[in-house]
């Protein structure tokens, strides 16, 4: 007789294979069409709140694997809180203004045409470009399974948003923190605009290394009592020498005169002698203070160069005498101001060419006018003649524009700054920002020191840009005096106009049209500021425009979390902190989480030229988005994160095990109508206790955002305990026990309890798969849930664990022997075996099930196949063949006769 039809075999419509690339897009489309996010909000009304404020990606180009990592991590955290019962908010957004979009428009229509168009037309083309890529990226982000307010995302180019960026600027101006002055800033000669520190990256560049002798003035030589002397400077920027105004020395150092008449730092003398910059012995020594305020002569143009002292002068290279051009260097400028000097020479125009200033101030011969500074370098060396002591070339790390990748320079121009050290109401922005950082929770903790160090050492924030596509610094200036007009009524009027017409109104409307009725008579006396805001000010104001003032349901200010790549310590985290602290005197976030960058499996940066780029769109097509999400969850994001086909295949294998576990659990509760743990067996209590321990630990780790450690623990539990032991052990009772036997129903109830919480636990990461599981789950699991978003995680009830570590160790040792017996073809199946032992712990009901053998007893006849001792040799475990016969229904060796059913199966069939 074939007994297969008498078995209660598992049944489920949940497929073994996910066919993720084909099925995920349909599921995601369904979620968004059914407004799942709105239902999530309704499901948690009145609960504790959590909001993650989205750092806006740039609306240009397709998303890359770094975007995917970032958005998936955000989504996992938001969903973790949701499935823990929190009322969550996540409003995605886009950064829409700025140079890269302007460059793309220029690339498309040509530079000449762009420069011939009115500003409003250029801005319209930029707006169209940004809008196109917002739609492209929106679909790509949604295809990652990211849930949020996609129906009402924030865009920094929306009219009301632009108005709020302007309002944030006005608030800062009213507090007196907006200052305008000439100051050296990073300047991109290619794009003709100022740059912030965060917009500069360092690349290798070949430059000159020159030593130049500045002869001392006659007065200086007379004061020092010497006949012939020059002070020697070292520089890598010959083009700045015409703008030299001083030479800085270290106040704590000694300076010496060589036999050949050159003054350098004493500490560097031997090195310079070896390099043939100086020669002979030291003939005289000076304190730096003896040289202070003396004059040297610039050999290029005969202008005086004053000797000053500065702490910034170091002894780690050069001559200890620093060429100082305050129009072309941040430190040069600072030390120059300390001395109270007001004049600054800055003879370079927007394009990096010498201006007419070199003629009017007699800095260089007239032939240099209009010459690019880099082209001028070798010609300047020729002009130096014998004063050029030494010249060579070398490669060093040099600042470049992060967008066009051309070298940048320091150039003093009139710009708007947010003042870091200006005292307002007895405090400075720098001090307030540093105090606020102390209140923020950082993951990883190293982020706090990193952000603090950057804020402590940063210069004033240059927020003005000389471009077209951005929010204008929409203030008026008095034509006659140049004074900036910061007037509440005018600001409010411009704000209201921007809300309706956008910031384009600044360019489209006349001054009179922009003024309120009561101020229109002022129009003829005013002019507009033409600069636009740094895009970092845009993104730094998102808390103001989204959480405080805008038409968004994005959660409260300050946000519970900001989450971005570690490069944002110098970018968005800092700009947001400075804008928020300027206006509200507090940080805009309660916590900051940072992640590393994506690299290939060798740890190398991805690039098209190397052919190692992994595109998220391709991963989704080949493996499925769930594999990408599981890759994020199982990776340690605190450092760089490796990704490759090989790594994704390993993740896919892990996914398969999780999916099959869920499938097994669902299939084996298909006929369960009610979860009822009336008298759970020892094995049920063991897995419930272990599940409680593991799930609690996983939830705690999720709460610390340590997903990789949590998944390592959870995956290990699923594979080695839930699947390899419990599910395997329970097959007999599930398939062979009578339908309603207590033993079977208790195990089914145990599985139902576990799978319900496992679904809620895995849902933040494997949302698609868990939703699919709910779709195919029986009523006892699903209850009234429409989908996975109607689930909420509930901690399991504590149960005493009846199986200790010693029993598990005995089981491990037993299965090592079983594996050997199978390899040696002594047995095919553990059910052929019986265990004879004198150890009371093993002589209990169900232990045979736990060891997957037919019988455990203290006395079993027959040959011993192997044995081992436990508990200091006191007890023995003997592995024998079962003396009984194989039951043709359950395959256990418990039948009294060959071909007969065992007692349990006889009852199951015949009652």
From Swiss-Prot:
Family affiliation: Belongs to the class-I aminoacyl-tRNA synthetase family. IleS type 1 subfamily.
InterPro entries: aa-tRNA-synth_I_CS, aa-tRNA-synth_Ia, Anticodon_Ile_BEm, Ile-tRNA-ligase, Ile-tRNA-ligase_type1, Ile-tRNA_ligase, M/V/L/I-tRNA-synth_anticd-bd, Rossmann-like_a/b/a_fold
Residues given in the record as ATP binding sites: 608
Reaction(s) the record says it catalyses: tRNA(Ile) + L-isoleucine + ATP = L-isoleucyl-tRNA(Ile) + AMP + diphosphate
Name listed for the protein in its UniProt record: Isoleucine--tRNA ligase
EC number: 6.1.1.5
Organism phylogeny: Bacteria, Pseudomonadati, Campylobacterota, Epsilonproteobacteria, Nautiliales
Gene Ontology MF terms: aminoacyl-tRNA deacylase activity; ATP binding; isoleucine-tRNA ligase activity; tRNA binding; zinc ion binding
Record localization: Cytoplasm
Cofactor(s) demanded: Zn(2+)
Motif ('KMSKS' region): 605-609
Function: Catalyzes the attachment of isoleucine to tRNA(Ile). As IleRS can inadvertently accommodate and process structurally similar amino acids such as valine, to avoid such errors it has two additional distinct tRNA(Ile)-dependent editing activities. One activity is designated as 'pretransfer' editing and involves the hydrolysis of activated Val-AMP. The other activity is designated 'posttransfer' editing and involves deacylation of mischarged Val-tRNA(Ile).
Motif extent ('HIGH' region): 57-67
């Amino acid at each position: 007789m074939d007994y297969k039809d008498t078995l209660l075999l598992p049944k489920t419509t949940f497929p073994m294979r996910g066919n993720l690339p084909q099925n995920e897009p349909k599921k995601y489309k369904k979620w968004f069409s059914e407004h799942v996010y709105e239902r999530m909000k309704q499901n948690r009304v009145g609960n504790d709140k959590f909001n993650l404020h989205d750092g806006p990606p740039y609306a240009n180009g397709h998303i890359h694997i770094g975007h995917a990592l970032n958005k998936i991590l955000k989504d996992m955290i938001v969903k973790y809180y949701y499935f823990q019962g929190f009322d969550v908010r996540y409003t995605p957004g886009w950064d829409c203004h700025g140079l890269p979009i302007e460059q793309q428009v220029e690339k498309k229509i040509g530079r000449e045409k762009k420069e011939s168009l009115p500003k409003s037309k250029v801005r319209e083309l930029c707006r169209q470009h940004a809008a196109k890529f917002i739609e492209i990226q929106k679909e790509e982000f949604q295809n990652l399974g990211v849930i949020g307010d996609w129906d009402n995302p924030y865009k920094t180019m929306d009219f009301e948003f632009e108005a709020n960026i302007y309002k944030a600027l006005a608030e800062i101006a009213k507090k007196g923190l907006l200052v305008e002055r000439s100051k050296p800033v990073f300047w991109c000669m290619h794009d003709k605009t100022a740059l912030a520190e965060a917009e500069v990256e360092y690349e290798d560049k070949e430059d000159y290394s020159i030593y130049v002798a500045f002869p001392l003035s006659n007065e200086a030589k007379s004061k020092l009592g010497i006949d012939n002397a020059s002070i020697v400077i070292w520089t890598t920027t010959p083009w700045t020498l015409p703008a030299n105004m001083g030479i800085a020395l270290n106040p704590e150092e000694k300076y010496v005169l060589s036999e050949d008449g050159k003054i350098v730092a004493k500490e560097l003398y031997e090195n310079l002698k070896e390099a043939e910059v100086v020669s002979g012995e030291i003939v005289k020594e000076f304190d730096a203070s003896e040289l202070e305020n003396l004059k040297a002569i610039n050999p290029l143009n005969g202008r005086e160069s004053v000797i000053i002292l500065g702490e910034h002068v170091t002894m780690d290279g050069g001559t200890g005498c620093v060429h100082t051009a305050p129009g072309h260097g941040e430190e040069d400028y600072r030390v120059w101001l300390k001395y109270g000097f007001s004049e600054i020479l800055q003879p370079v125009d927007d394009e990096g060419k010498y201006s007419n200033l070199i003629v009017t101030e007699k800095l260089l011969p007239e032939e240099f006018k209009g010459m690019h500074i880099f082209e001028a370098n070798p010609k300047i060396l020729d002009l130096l003649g014998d004063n050029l002591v030494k010249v060579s070339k070398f490669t060093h790390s040099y600042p470049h524009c992060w967008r066009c990748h051309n070298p940048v320079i320091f150039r003093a121009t009139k710009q708007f700054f947010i003042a870091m050290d200006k005292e307002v109401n007895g405090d400075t922005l720098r001090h307030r920002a540093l105090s606020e950082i102390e209140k923020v929770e950082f993951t990883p903790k190293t982020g706090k020191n990193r952000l603090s160090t950057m804020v402590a050492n940063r210069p004033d924030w240059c927020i003005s840009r000389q471009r077209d596509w951005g929010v204008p610094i929409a203030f008026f200036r008095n034509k006659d005096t140049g004074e900036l007009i910061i007037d509440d009524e005018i600001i409010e009027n411009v704000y209201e106009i921007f809300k309706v017409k956008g910031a384009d109104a600044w360019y489209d409307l006349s001054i009179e049209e922009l003024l309120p009725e009561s101020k229109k008579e002022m129009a003829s006396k005013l002019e507009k500021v033409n600069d636009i805001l740094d895009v970092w000010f845009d993104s730094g104001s998102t808390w103001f425009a989204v959480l405080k003032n805008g038409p968004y349901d994005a959660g409260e200010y300050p946000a519970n979390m900001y989450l971005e790549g570690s490069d944002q310590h110098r970018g968005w985290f800092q700009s947001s902190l400075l804008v928020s602290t300027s206006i509200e005197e507090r940080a805009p976030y309660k916590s900051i989480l940072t992640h590393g960058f994506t690299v290939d499996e060798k740890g190398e940066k991805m690039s098209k030229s190397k052919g190692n780029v992994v595109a998220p769109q391709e991963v989704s097509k080949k493996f499925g988005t769930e594999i990408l999400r599981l890759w994020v969850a199982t990776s340690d994001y605190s450092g760089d994160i490796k990704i490759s086909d090989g790594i994704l295949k390993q993740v896919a294998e892990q996914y398969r095990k999780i999916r099959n576990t869920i499938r097994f659990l669902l299939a084996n509760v298909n006929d369960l109508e009610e979860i009822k743990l009336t008298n759970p067996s020892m094995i049920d209590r063991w897995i419930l206790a272990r599940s409680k321990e593991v799930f609690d630990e996983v939830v705690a780790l999720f709460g610390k955002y340590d997903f990789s450690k949590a998944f390592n623990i959870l995956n290990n539990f699923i594979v080695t305990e839930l699947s390899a032991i419990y599910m395997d052990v329970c097959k007999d009772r599930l398939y062979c026990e009578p339908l309603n036997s207590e033993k079977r129903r208790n195990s089914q109830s145990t599985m139902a309890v576990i799978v319900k919480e496992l679904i809620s636990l895995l849902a933040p990461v494997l949302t698609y798969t868990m939703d699919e599981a709910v779709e195919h789950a029986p009523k006892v699991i699903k209850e009234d849930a429409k989908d996975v978003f109607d689930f909420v995680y509930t901690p399991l009830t504590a149960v005493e664990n009846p199986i200790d570590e010693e029993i598990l160790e005995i089981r491990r040792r037993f299965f090592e022997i079983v594996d050997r017996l199978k390899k040696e073809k002594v047995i095919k199946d553990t059910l052929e075996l019986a265990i004879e032992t004198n150890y009371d712990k093993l002589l209990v009901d169900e232990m045979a099930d736990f060891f997957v053998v037919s019988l455990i007893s203290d006395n079993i006849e027959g040959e011993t196949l192997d044995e081992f001792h436990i508990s200091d040799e006191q007890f023995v475990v003997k592995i024998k063949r079962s003396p009984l016969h194989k039951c043709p229904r359950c395959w256990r060796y418990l039948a009294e006769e060959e071909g007969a059913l065992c007692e349990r199966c006889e009852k199951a069939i015949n009652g």
